[in-house]
Amino acid sequence: MKSFLKSLRTRYAFYRQCYLDAKRFRDSISPGKLGPAAAVARIEGDIVRQYHVIEKGLTMPDFRPGFGKDMVRGLVRSMRALEKHPCAARCDSGQLGAARATLREYHERHAALGHDISEILPDNCRDLWENATPGDGGSRPFTPVASGDADAFERVVRSRASVRSFDAARTPSRETIMAAVDLAMRSPSVCNRQTARIHVFTGEDAQRALSFQSGNRGFGHRIPMVIIVTSDLRYFTGTAERYQGWIDGGMFSMLLLLALHAQGLGAVSLNWSVNNERDRELRNAVAIPEYERVIMLIGCGFPSPDGLVPVSSRRLATDVASWGK
């Protein structure tokens, strides 16, 4: 009987955590759960998703005139909805500019072919693209990486290691961190929605954040800066994307770690594999919004000159790769 009750309690705890994960996702993507200021993120997410689908169509090797008509019309509706929204000023102007430039290229490509798209993109929508800056969105030529750049990238990747010995007297500048974040924003994301967010803490705030993470014992007190990576769930749609925050946030985090290393900083990945109760404690302590999913923590700083790092032996590529017939 004791074994049965223990099994029952374990199952209950498991399903409860799954339910709380699902509830956060559901509440974050449900328009009725969002206030006016937060709901504009949903419109922005629709705009990004729609213009990026059109961008992909513009890059297809066999251009098909009139492609994506439903997506183009949807983008126009979303942009008009944003114009009427009381919190429209909160929308990322860069993403809106990309949408305008994409519509402009779509119009110009068809005009050059003499293909009539007035039923898809009528003249009364001209204000949406006529002042767009070419190159802000749409398509561009692809530039392969030069061999020297590939060698430099390999050196960055192979030399990166998890640093746990920091110079506690030095804290990275905001400019250095933002330069790394700017590079990390080049990471892939579903339909280019770019849901990754960061929360940066130093001093006592960094130590407060670390107190909720169990993997920094013995060195956490020497970490001068903590970066919490999250994913903004408001930009996702439907249950099929319920794991996308972790996927996109993970890719962003990896590129951020490489970028920090390239900036001459040391960093250590601190996992956030916790239950929702511990997650709640961190959120309350450092004010992370309910609609953001915590992906991981990163301890960051200048590496100690005499510090050591683990060898961390890696599997061979041949051990993990399989090739289809």
Predicted regions and their residues:
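Acidic, surface-exposed loops and disordered segments
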Residues: 1-325
